[in-house]
Amino acid sequence: MKAIRFYPNVPADVRAIEQKAAMTILEAIHRYAETGAGRVKPLSGEFEGLLRLRVGNHRVFFEETADTITIHRVLDRKEAYR
């Protein structure tokens, strides 16, 4: 399993989400760290170098190395690309 790190703003992002959805998002992050499974897509443009994990109506923006996943933001899809 890859180590998971969070940028300082991520806890606030997660607290702003309904608890059930937040738990689903955290489970999806852990599943991806363990297995690589999930709806992941590399981003381009101003977000180039980041990956996006789609979890329901939310998007998890992160970068990945061989042994670490660093979560940058967790946002509702309506706010994700603004």
Question: What feature does the model see in each segment?
Answer:
Residues 1-12, 16-23, 38, 54-58, ...:
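Enriched for short, Lys/Arg-rich terminal
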Residues 28-53, 81:
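A short, surface-exposed loop/turn module that caps and links secondary-structure elements
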